[in-house]
């Protein structure tokens, strides 16, 4: 594996190791070449310190940096904010399950309707996902 450290039941490479691995190595893990290039770009940004993915960072600036990466759109940026930044107001407005659960077809309308859930929209997203899986 590519990791410098291991935890019980967990072994994951550092951002620098992923960045150095190259897109071909990432693609061999079953990831499409385009996504592999996105993963490499993200890893390089994190390894260089240009992108910090930790709770407490400026969320808006981090979302902007994420969306500037190749292959990273609003869904991916908000998902990373929800998980890595632990941002409770992340909202995946163009998520198919979210749109269906909200009986919406347009992300802009889902975004507007979600205003009532601020600042806890990430919890609403998880609730909608959970409801769809049962």
Regions from the PLM with identified roles:
Residues 1-134:
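HhH-family (HhH-GPD) DNA N-glycosylase catalytic core used in base-excision repair
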């Amino acid at each position: 594996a590519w990791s410098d450290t291991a935890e019980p039941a967990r072994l994951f490479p550092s951002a620098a190791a992923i960045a150095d691995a190259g897109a071909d190595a990432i693609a061999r893990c079953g990831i499409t070449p385009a996504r592999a290039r996105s993963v490499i770009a993200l890893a390089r940004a994190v390894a260089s310190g240009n992108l910090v993915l930790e709770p407490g960072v400026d969320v808006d600036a981090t979302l902007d940096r994420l969306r500037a990466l190749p292959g990273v759109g609003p869904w991916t940026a908000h998902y990373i904010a929800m998980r890595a930044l632990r941002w409770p107001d992340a909202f995946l407005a163009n998520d198919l399950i979210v749109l269906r659960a909200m009986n919406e077809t347009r992300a802009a309308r889902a975004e507007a309707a979600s205003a009532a859930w601020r600042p806890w929209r990430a919890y609403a997203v998880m609730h909608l996902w959970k409801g769809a899986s049962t």
